[in-house]
Amino acid sequence: MISYDASNRLKVILSYQGTILPSVLSYMVWMLLWTGSLLFVFKFFELQFDLGSQLHTFLGVALVFLLVMRTNSSYDRYWEGRKQLGALGITARNLAVKSNSVIPDSEQGFRTEISSLIGAYVLCVKEHLRDGITQKELKGLSSANREELENFSSPPNGILCILGKRLRSCIDQKWMAPPEFGSFNSSLDDLQGVLRALDRIRFTPLPFAYVNQLKVFMMIYLGTLPLVLIPQFDYLTLIGMFFAVYAFVGIEEI
């Protein structure tokens, strides 16, 4: 998530990082080349015909409804992800506080290990949802923890497993009664649940039929739109197509 100042309109408008511009740039270039080619044909052969705008107005309304559904879906995924990240932070902090409440002050090394494992889990979840987990996210762990983690194919699950073992050892050390472990186990389950929920949001695609319908519909609409605009706007059609592609394809890419 990118932090920004909504009141600074100019900075938001001129921002590049985090926008959909990199995703739509290639599509925009191809559509402008297509529009330029049609302009050349119209000028070279001196074509004089007007398709009218009624059909494209009707198709545009239908396309807008499809894009509204896409926007609502994107916002729902964003909001659900934001809630899960909030739950991740709260659960991690609560687990750390509960751990410190049962581990004696004299066991600073054990306290540090538990805190490091919890912090590493949060970082692993973040990178798991991005480009993959690297050693940078695990540098806060001890060499023994990193070596133990090599036995697991999934670092986040491995960290939870190690955490469970370490916290269960508190029972053997008489630092907590067995019934108390249920609260810690519940927190570990919550951390696992957050990871699964974020995985679902990140990796569940939209239905293929919907994506296919939207992309084909948009390609036909934008591909034929210059034929409507050129007789009326001439070279200004290039500017009109720039904004049309940016608006429609940009919303579809969100």
Outline where the language-model segments fall:
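Solvent-exposed interaction patches of small proteins and small membrane subunits
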Residues: 17-21, 151-152, 212
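N-terminal juxtamembrane/topogenic regions of multi-pass membrane proteins
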Residues: 1-86, 105, 109, 231-238, ...
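Short, hydrophobic/aromatic alpha-helical segments in well-folded domains
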Residues: 74, 124, 225-226
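Transmembrane alpha-helical segments and their cytosolic interface motifs
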Residues: 22-31, 199-232
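C-terminal, helix-dominated tail/subdomain
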Residues: 120, 215-253
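Membrane-cytosol interface motif
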Residues: 83-100, 246, 254
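Structured inter-helical modules in multipass membrane proteins
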Residues: 98-210
